[in-house]
Amino acid sequence: MKFFSLTFLIVMMICTTTFAAEIPPPSILVSGEGIVEAQPDRATISVGVVTREKNPAAVQSANARTATSVINSIVALGIERRNISTGNYSFNPVYRHHDNGKRTLDGYEATNSVTIIVDDLNLVGKVIDAALNHGANRVDSLNFGLRNKAAHQDEALRLAVLDAKRKAEVAAFALGKNIVSVRNVSINSSHVSAPRNYKMARSMAMEDAAADVETPIESGTLTCSASVHVEFEISR
């Protein structure tokens, strides 16, 4: 009988130990955010040359001639040709629509979009003015960026992780627990944002070019942000 009781006690201790071992340790799941502000050191400008003529050969020739003049004026400012590229080229017939539902061919339209990368931000206004003064009749976009974007994104990510760690430590202390280890890390997002109203830039460029005044350009500040979710294991 004593042997049976001892055996039963040992079995119960083993079961209790096994059951306790199967219960995962408690954890805290927190989110962290990191934000880094940076001054842009690169601008990407897209200008367009739109020409319309009755004859397809004439519209192609006129568009090519104007686009070449635009590109040459930009190169004259010191922009290397490797930083100038054709973003898009289209050639389409243009129709006139009548009240009776019919349409007639009214000519042809060619559009050549030129993309320019500018690493000297002091030249951004000059590039826009030169393009408009030499035949470009559209400014499609103006975006500011960073040449070494990864370094700023890495810093934002580091700050996001530290933010998550700080939150976990505060929560664990309030619970009377300690952080034991990191169980899981999830990087939610990491990006660079710079809101820019290119329509305003286009309007300013048109007005200032007509007035023979250099287009004023303010690059503002870029925001590099990152967010993470981190699960920390805490003491029992």
Language-model-detected regions and their locations in the chain:
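Short, charge-dense linear interaction motifs
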Residues: 2-6, 15-134, 138-236
